[in-house]
Amino acid sequence: MTYARIDTNHKEIVAALRQAGATVVSLAAMKHGCPDLLVGYQNETLLMEIKKDKKAKFTPDQIEFMGKWKGGAVSRVDSVDAAIRALGITRKVL
């Protein structure tokens, strides 16, 4: 059995989304180009693909998935701030 690779920032991003009030389901184990996260926030459903940094590219499977996906766009996030922005909110700086 092979396991899906989880980006190092995955847990941090999931925790921040949940703290912001989102429901988060990790889809990382699905493979076949499926985005990493299913996110529900304020009656909206989002898909998020986590990347380790700004330079990381989509895999061919991810590109194929997004090309066939009939729902909303997949958000590419590489940081907590990017994930929070994808929700349409700005994180408060303390």
Regions found by a protein language model. Give the residues of each.
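Catalytic phosphate/metal-binding cores of nucleic-acid and nucleotide-processing enzymes, i.e., regions
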Residues: 1-94
